[in-house]
Amino acid sequence: MTMIKITDLDLTGKRVLIRSDLNVPVKNGVITSNRKIHASLPTIKLALKKSKHVMVTSHLGRPIEGEYNAQFSLQPVVEYLKKQLINRYVKEVRLVKDYLEGVNFMEGELLILENVRFNKGEKKDDEILSKKYAMLCDVFIMDAFGSAHRTQASTHGIGKFVSLACSGLLLQKELEALGKALCNPMRPMVAIVGGSKVSTKLIVLDSLSKVADYLIVGGGIANTFLAAQGKKVGKSLYEEELIPTAKRLLENCDIPILTDVRVSTEFSETAPVTMKAIIDIKDNEQILDLGDESITRILDILNCAKTILWNGPIGVFEFPNFRKGTEMISHAIAKSNAFSIVGGGDTLMAIDLFDISNQISYISTGGGAFLEFIEGKTFPSVKMLEKHALNNMN
């Protein structure tokens, strides 16, 4: 991928608009996880060093498009950015609600343009809206990896009309990390895919089966693979219609099959836990976590890995009685010398729970984008940035 980078440009005297991914969880006006803002800060700080006229925008939540709703305002993000930037990078951080007809800067301020989803036509990549975004700036910086797979006005459409578009530091890091894991991995390469359903991650599993030396499946997904081998799964969640798909994947890739599991007759954090061999599962029991023998086998594989990609928990880790598999695998990845990359909301919750964030090589900010990159899909915003790079070479 050839793109112009923010580090390539002299932004002196330029109006700069950064599309970040500041879509953070907010409860009662308070941000409950600042991970995405923290990841976006290096690009914002660099832009502020290079230009006196910097604007940042993002979506937040799922408001009704075209309607203002205070619940989805970027105001909590503004308050967080004030603490991070005032007196060191800027004098003020100001939220601008009405900006489509133009904005005015005061000296030493960073402008945060209100939630793009308050603008009619954002999600449909509306041409008129895209032109209005483009009129605001001389340089557009796309840094929202988490939205890079979407064809929307603030991530893609603006690029058709702005004179210059480049990638931010975060977008570049995301693409490089995923490329390192998927396009040219150090081997053995181990992929871990958890979650409840094969159907939601079918293309991901298919893509990873072609690049991974070992494909470890967990959660409800593993139950479908067990059923494909004729194993008992009791009343566990599995997808009978996808058994032929699971059989095909088992033939094409080394997928370690569980030998023992933790089961219960009820789905509860207070449910009694029984560890037993797969062959001993009763019809009224459901698989909720890995057994010790299965965990040991997976840890042996991870200990030899040079590249590890992880998406999705291995068991019902939200319940203390069924989190051992996810916990042990988390710590094994943290201790490994392999290049490790993780992505997906539940997976990030797990690494936060077990306090291993600082021991992971790269934590992706993308959920759907992370999965779509693994699937091999083309990102419209990346294609747009590549076109700008090509046009500037000619």
Curated annotation (Swiss-Prot):
KW Transferase (keyword) present: yes
GO CC annotation terms, alphabetical: cytosol
Localization: Cytoplasm
Keyword entries, A-Z: ATP-binding, Cytoplasm, Glycolysis, Kinase, Nucleotide-binding, Transferase
Superkingdom of origin: Bacteria
One GO process term, biological-process aspect: glycolytic process
Protein EC: 2.7.2.3
Chain sites annotated for binding ATP: K201, E318, G344, G345, D346, T347
Recorded catalytic activity of this chain's protein: (2R)-3-phosphoglycerate + ATP = (2R)-3-phospho-glyceroyl phosphate + ADP
Single Gene Ontology MF annotation: phosphoglycerate kinase activity
Pfam families according to UniProt: PGK
Pathway(s) per entry: Carbohydrate degradation; glycolysis; pyruvate from D-glyceraldehyde 3-phosphate: step 2/5
Chain sites annotated for binding substrate: D21, L22, N23, H59, L60, G61, R62, R117, R150
PANTHER family: PHOSPHOGLYCERATE KINASE, PHOSPHOGLYCERATE KINASE 1, CHLOROPLASTIC-RELATED
Record-stated family: Belongs to the phosphoglycerate kinase family.
Assembly, per entry: Monomer.
Name of this protein: Phosphoglycerate kinase
Gene: pgk
